[in-house]
Amino acid sequence: MTNVNRRPDWIKVKAPNSAEYYNTKDLIKNLRLNTVCEEAACPNIGECWSRKHATVMILGSVCTRACRFCNVKTGRPDLLDPHEPRRLAEAVQKLNLNHVVITSVDRDDLEDGGASHFAECINEIRRSSPNTTIEILTPDFLRKAGAVEVIANSKPDVFNHNVETVPSLYKTIRPGARYYNSLSLLHNIKKLSPEIFTKSGMMVGLGEEINEVVQVMDDLREANVDFLTIGQYLQPTKSHAEVIKYVTPEEFKYLERIAKTKGFLMVSATPLTRSSYHADKDFQKLKENYNIRLASM
């Protein structure tokens, strides 16, 4: 086991300093958009923003949940901004994005959990940037009747919802969520709109056992999930859940090999893998792998 008191060399990244990084930062600030890159203190922000790739966080910057792994602010959220979908579409245009990733905080205070706001954002982008592919990373819409239908009908190219961790750790790491609700959400999106690629991710290093990770893989395939991401959990602050283990690159390769035997179209498993890391390139690979599988049937 790697010493958890300091981050190993394979986790360290260079500080962002490119002109493209600052251009992206300024544009996001000027359009008054939130990003999960900043709010969740993502280690890949320098690389992604230098490539003009940012994951926009809609529905405000305050979450109604308090997951032990997440750095996003929690509390009473702001009122919905009706102009946010238009500003988001403007940012996509100005950044000339081929692929955009949209995520959000949890909004348990809203009747549909924010599903219709996601749909409005998708529609605005489709109108102004019809060639841009759209990936959404949503909350679980727990006890929000009709939300899954709204999302499925909005037809994103990729629907992502993260299970985050193994079921045995939900009470301590993700107490406001339900593992089987997350699986059901993923399964129902695929059932309602089979043409949408589905994706889910989890963190390791929180104390889970290998056999539990493998069971999550099986559960996700049972839900017809196409793409699995696995990355190292990093503690945002001392008040968050502790890192129990730094999983080595070799162990990540082992997990990737196992996952590939399960039938996923795509697997990304590295210490720095995050849900939207290299999402644009991965979407192209996802389509290629789908076409290869289709041709072999």
Swiss-Prot record:
It catalyses: [[Fe-S] cluster scaffold protein carrying a second [4Fe-4S](2+) cluster] + N(6)-octanoyl-L-lysyl-[protein] + 2 oxidized [2Fe-2S]-[ferredoxin] + 2 S-adenosyl-L-methionine + 4 H(+) = [[Fe-S] cluster scaffold protein] + N(6)-[(R)-dihydrolipoyl]-L-lysyl-[protein] + 4 Fe(3+) + 2 hydrogen sulfide + 2 5'-deoxyadenosine + 2 L-methionine + 2 reduced [2Fe-2S]-[ferredoxin]. It is found in: Cytoplasm. [4Fe-4S] cluster 2 binds at residues 63, 67, 70. Binds 2 [4Fe-4S] clusters per subunit. One cluster is coordinated with 3 cysteines and an exchangeable S-adenosyl-L-methionine. One of its GO terms (cellular component) is cytoplasm. Pathway: Protein modification; protein lipoylation via endogenous pathway; protein N(6)-(lipoyl)lysine from octanoyl-[acyl-carrier-protein]: step 2/2. Its EC number is 2.8.1.8. GO terms for molecular function: 4 iron, 4 sulfur cluster binding; lipoate synthase activity; metal ion binding. Belongs to the radical SAM superfamily. Lipoyl synthase family. [4Fe-4S] cluster 1 binds at residues 37, 42, 48, 276. Residues 49-265 form the Radical SAM core domain. Gene3D superfamilies: Aldolase class I. The gene is lipA. It comes from Rickettsia typhi (strain ATCC VR-144 / Wilmington). It holds the Pfam family Radical_SAM. This is Lipoyl synthase. It comes from the Bacteria. PANTHER family: LIPOYL SYNTHASE, LIPOYL SYNTHASE, MITOCHONDRIAL. PROSITE patterns: RADICAL_SAM. Keywords: 4Fe-4S, Cytoplasm, Iron, Iron-sulfur, Metal-binding, S-adenosyl-L-methionine, Transferase. Its cofactor is [4Fe-4S] cluster. Its main location: cytoplasm.
